[in-house]
């Protein structure tokens, strides 16, 4: 047996193009597990969506809560997280998550999933707020704190809504090093300015941006 360390898509790259491997079967419809499992990959899509959302949000909440507790800005919410984990993870079995329970069962399952989502979101919000309250936000304009819940650095467009008493002619945004970053004023209405920022935030970290009026 030869073990190769590679990315998840390497197998497909090695076999492409498909025309060179006519021996590979073609599946049309459900990808069955031998002779059973029809519908398990597609039935009850909402249940699968809620489950995945809980997995992602739970990880983000756990990471943020640990950081907040370690920094002393919030106490680790053990009971809340344990309750949220147990409530949604109990549905990760056959028949519930696979989509093969009776329809009536999902009225209860969806409720559990949504309760856990709310609990994880609450932990994430309070933990991030605790850490953010201790960051240095002494900037010339309006400070904007961004949090990256992923375990890898993220560079992406971020839309923020800022309170501004009057419509600005434009906005300029600077990062923590004082470097100007790409930004766009999207709209202004009722004292609220929608601003798009090309931001970069470290893995499981925070970044403070300085938003100033004027182009």
Q: Predicted segment positions?
A:
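Catalytic-domain carbohydrate-binding cleft regions of carbohydrate-active enzymes
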Residues: 1-146, 156, 167-186, 190-207
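Noncatalytic alpha-helical scaffolds and linker/capping helices
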Residues: 147-151
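NTP-handling and nucleic-acid-processing catalytic cores
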Residues: 157-161
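Active/binding-pocket-proximal capping segment
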Residues: 163-165
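Short, hydrophobic/aromatic-enriched beta-strand segments in well-ordered soluble domains
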Residues: 207-215
